[in-house]
């Protein structure tokens, strides 16, 4: 589905990753892939797993909540259909006046779209059974005649994709600290799915499916392609190849064999996008740089070349120790040897350690800047400061824009 449950963005994204062999919809920004017809056999409420956490809405209720699905309520569009902004009462979950109650995002299935009832049903059943801080909350659904709708919590910050790749005043580039926070949150969501009583393979982990709340907490959305993992003595699930080009694990593409380690590979691609600010596939780049993993893989293992991969908008925000650890983790996730890939619990542990380093670095920055402010009181007013300096901290060399006296021997 891949539609942002967030602020209205309709511009087409250049160079976005295409879909392949998939009834999965395009991302919220409308680039198109081949059509898959919707199945027409009868559908009933009996297909939906019982969940006390979900409300069954009538079509009339959602029509009222979205002001009759008015065009100016559209948040995004994709293969599933359109997403509309609406309002409901927090207690009764009935439609409320615009600007009052709880803001919701309503996905309305387009019967001529690329996704159908099975994807809709998977979304209802998985999100209806699961509750986790890093999974988007499904409030309810509507299954009435030909109508298929999903009702979610509203995610005001939009998708990670938009924050990494959009340009303009609406989306500001994410800071290094926020990127680590989002990467960790998404990893926790994926780990939760893999650790379920019957593991769940997400199968379409990508930046457009990672949504951000007002505090930049990451939440996984779009479970239309999710599958139960192998059970008993089975090592994998065999399935038709579906997903998004540039994110799928090579062994899955070659054999159709799906495991939780397939998700780990996809996570590695996203982590590389977070580190580099580049898309997994970008046809607008030079031929040798269009496929991010192929281009970056040899650079990630070389500390002297790693700077070529790191997003230049992150200049002076990170230590080399942090960057190297993120690069090493991405490489491990992207290895061709399935058994050598970490599981998502290990990924979470590594990222928590990196986040601790980042927080320690931030404290050191504050301490050094306080010291420098005290020293600056004794510096002659006519001394001209330079643009910045580098300092050694417990987590490595970190650059800062704090000015330094040009002729002071303390900074040689």
From Swiss-Prot:
The protein depicted here goes by the name Probable serine/threonine-protein kinase PBL10
**Residue positions of covalent lipid attachment, annotated as N-myristoyl glycine:** 2
GO biological process per UniProt: defense response; positive regulation of stomatal opening
Phenotype when inactivated?
A: No visible phenotype under normal growth conditions. Leaves of well-watered mutant plants have increased relative water content due to decreased stomata opening.
The answer to keyword Cell membrane applying to this record is yes
Task: Identify one Pfam family in the record.
Answer: PK_Tyr_Ser-Thr
Indicate the residues that form the catalytic site: 204 (proton acceptor)
Q: What does this protein do?
A: Possible bi-functional kinase. In vitro, it exhibits serine/threonine activity. In vivo, can phosphorylate tyrosine residues of limited substrates. May be involved in plant defense signaling. Required for full light-induced stomatal opening.
Record-level Gene Ontology MF annotations: ATP binding; protein serine kinase activity; protein serine/threonine kinase activity; protein tyrosine kinase activity
Query: Where are stretches of biased composition, namely Polar residues?
Result: 23-43
Modified positions (Phosphothreonine) in chain numbering: 58, 239, 244
Against Gene3D superfamilies, the record matches this protein to: Phosphorylase Kinase, domain 1, Transferase(Phosphotransferase) domain 1
Which top EC class is named for this enzyme in its record? Answer: transferase
User: What's the chief localization of this chain?
Assistant: membrane
- Quaternary state and interactors: Interacts with the Xanthomonas campestris effector XopAC/AvrAC.
Q: In which tissues is it expressed?
A: Expressed in stomatal guard cells of leaves.
Give residues where Phosphotyrosine occurs. Answer: 152, 252
Q: Which family does it belong to?
A: Belongs to the protein kinase superfamily. Ser/Thr protein kinase family.
Q: Which residues form the Protein kinase domain?
A: 69-356
What sections of the protein cross the membrane? none
InterPro entries in alphabetical order? Kinase-like_dom_sf, Plant_Ser_Thr_Prot_Kinase, Prot_kinase_dom, Protein_kinase_ATP_BS, Ser-Thr/Tyr_kinase_cat_dom, Ser/Thr_kinase_AS
Indicate yes or no for the key word Phosphoprotein.
yes
Residues holding ATP: 75-83, 107
Q: Where in the cell is it found?
A: Cell membrane
Q: What is its EC number?
A: 2.7.11.1
Q: GO cellular component annotations, sorted alphabetically?
A: plasma membrane
